[in-house]
Amino acid sequence: MLDRQRILERFLSYVKIDTESDPNSDTTPSTDKQWKLANKLAKELEAIGLSEVRIDDNAYVMGTLPSNVKHKVPAIGFISHFDTSPDFTAANVNPQIVENYDGKDIVLNAEENIVLSPNYFDDLLLYKGQTLITTDGTTLLLSLIHISEPTRPSL
């Protein structure tokens, strides 16, 4: 069974790493600071039991989670990127956690009058009753997280 608090802490540690991309770079990843997250992810994959964990020259992190059944099953891959847009800062991310979202406006930043409202983003209502992780209005972070109860792996 998943430990919700550990997942939340892990996610928050990821979003606090500045991974802002550089549009003028001709390398992949476009900044050295993106390697920090790649290395962290690789270490954590090893810690939860994945094998063949590696980071290639482009900072792609790969690993294998061995099957836990005897019969042949299809393989699955999860692919994502960890750079963030240079259009807004990725430094000093200050996530806000909204437990048991009530379907009302979420004040991201009272001082700047930044509000996330289902009046403008009606898909927010799909997440009523769930935990939301949002920006404080000063960075790009806006993630809706839904923690389910998969059977593997134990995190």
Describe each region flagged by the PLM.
Residues 145-149, 153-155:
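Single conserved hydrophobic/aromatic residue that forms the stacking wall/gate
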Residues 133-143:
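A short glycine/serine-rich beta->alpha loop
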Residues 81, 143-144:
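Conserved acidic functional residues
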Residues 3-134:
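Acidic/His- and Gly-rich active-site-bordering loop/insert found
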